[in-house]
Amino acid sequence: MIPKDKEIVIIGCGIVGLALGRKFIIEGYKNIKLIEKETSVASHQSSRNSGVMHAGLYYEPNSLKAELSREGIVLMKDYCTKNCIEWEECGKIVAAKDKNEINRLENLFARGKRNNLKGLRLLNGKEINFYEPYLDGKAGIYVPEESIVSYFDV
C-alpha cells in the first residue's frame, strides 16, 4: 500500500488514468498529479472506445477475465446510475451466418450460461429479425445484459 502522504503521478488522462486518479482521491490521497500531453482528456485510445459494457459472454468460465467482466458490468451500471450518467441496456445479438457457425454459436451459448449471464436466449433466423430486421442469420444468441454508455460522459 502506498503511504497517503506520498505524491502520486499518473501519466495519461484517458479513462484509465482518470479512473485511477478518482480512486486515489476516494481512498484519501491528497497529492495526486495527472499529466497529459494533449490539450484535452481522453484524446487517444479512450476516444475510440465503443462504450460497450461487456457482460462476459466470450470469456473462459472461471477465468479472471470472466470474473472481472461480470463484476465490472455491475459496478459500471451502478456508477453510471449514481452519477446520473445515461446508459442503455440494449442487448446484443451474436449471429451465425451459416450452418457451419451454428456449432460454435451453441458452444458460446453454453459458455455464457456457465458465466451466469442472465436472460441468454438461443434464436432462430425469424427470432433474430424480431430484434434486428436486416440481420441475415441462421441462428443467434440474444445477450440482454450487454449495455452501452458514452465514454466521454463517464
Predicted features along the sequence, with ranges:
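Beta1/beta-strand and adjacent pyrophosphate-binding region of the FAD-binding site
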Residues: I2-V16, K33
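Short hydrophobic segments within beta-strands
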Residues: I11, I35, A95-A96, P144
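Glycine-rich FAD pyrophosphate-binding loop
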Residues: I25-R48
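Dinucleotide-binding Rossmann-like beta1-alpha1 core, especially the glycine-rich loop
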Residues: G51-Y131, G137
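Helical element adjacent to the flavin cofactor pocket in flavoenzyme catalytic cores
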Residues: I141-V154
